[in-house]
Swiss-Prot record:
Keywords: Acyltransferase, Cell outer membrane, Membrane, Signal, Transferase. GO terms for cellular component: cell outer membrane. The record marks K73 as: Role in lipopolysaccharide recognition. Transfers a fatty acid residue from the sn-1 position of a phospholipid to the N-linked hydroxyfatty acid chain on the proximal unit of lipid A or its precursors. InterPro entries: LipidA_acyl_PagP, OMP/PagP_b-brl. This is Lipid A acyltransferase PagP. One of its GO terms (biological process) is lipid A biosynthetic process. It is found in: Cell outer membrane. It comes from Cronobacter sakazakii (strain ATCC BAA-894) (Enterobacter sakazakii). It catalyses: a lipid A + a 1,2-diacyl-sn-glycero-3-phosphocholine = a hepta-acyl lipid A + a 2-acyl-sn-glycero-3-phosphocholine; a lipid IVA + a 1,2-diacyl-sn-glycero-3-phosphocholine = a lipid IVB + a 2-acyl-sn-glycero-3-phosphocholine; a lipid IIA + a 1,2-diacyl-sn-glycero-3-phosphocholine = a lipid IIB + a 2-acyl-sn-glycero-3-phosphocholine.
Length: 192
């Protein structure tokens, strides 16, 4: 097993443990998944029906992990994903962020890639200035790529962010194998 595959497997196991915590009884697992799906559905509906903000998304950077690619490939790839998006978002009673979004940007091959989904982040305000915030969470959505004939591709990815007031720099990491995936993708999210 290569280092890249071990890293991917470690990340996958970590996020599966967060998303689907193990219970003492195997019989409780289906109820846990059902409860998680119900909460997810409720959060999506509440964000859609009762948003607090309208968001502008501006893609900022894609970076292909150099340890996971041949140099010839990374030399050809686009890492400036210009595009734009919009969304609706809210902060819940715990101070966590929920958002629905749609975005289109130029992918690694400089072709348009749309993405739409729901994102959630646990949010912390570690400084005395409450305008500064950091977050960790996930996004569930669907994308489509030119090199896959624009077939819809479901996704579950980690999210992280750092922000001040209405401006947030949000990011994800797309895991993969050698010469595929292993991409850091980040964007600016402005709340109005």
């Amino acid at each position: 097993m290569t280092v890249v595959n071990k890293s991917f497997l470690t990340i996958l196991i970590f996020f599966c443990q967060i998303l689907f915590p193990l219970n003492a009884s195997a019989l409780e697992a289906p109820r846990t998944v059902k409860a998680w799906a119900s909460v997810l559905g409720d959060n999506i509906a509440e964000t859609w029906n009762e948003p607090q903000h309208v968001d502008l998304y501006v893609p900022a950077i894609t970076w292909h992990a150099r340890f996971a690619y041949d140099k010839e490939k990374t030399d050809r790839y686009n890492e400036r994903p210009w595009g734009a998006g919009m969304g609706k978002s809210r902060w819940d009673e715990k101070g966590n962020w929920h958002g629905l979004y749609v975005m289109a940007f130029k992918d690694s091959y400089n072709k348009w890639e749309p993405i739409a989904g729901y994102g959630w982040e646990a949010t912390w305000r570690p400084l005395t200035d409450d305008a500064f915030h950091v977050g960790l969470g996930y996004t569930v959505g669907v994308t489509a790529r030119d090199n896959w004939d624009y077939i819809p591709i479901p996704l579950v990815l980690p999210l992280a962010s750092v922000g001040y007031g209405p401006a947030t720099f949000q990011m994800t990491y797309i895991p993969g194998t050698y010469n595929n995936g292993n991409v850091y993708f980040a964007w600016l999210r402005l709340q109005f």
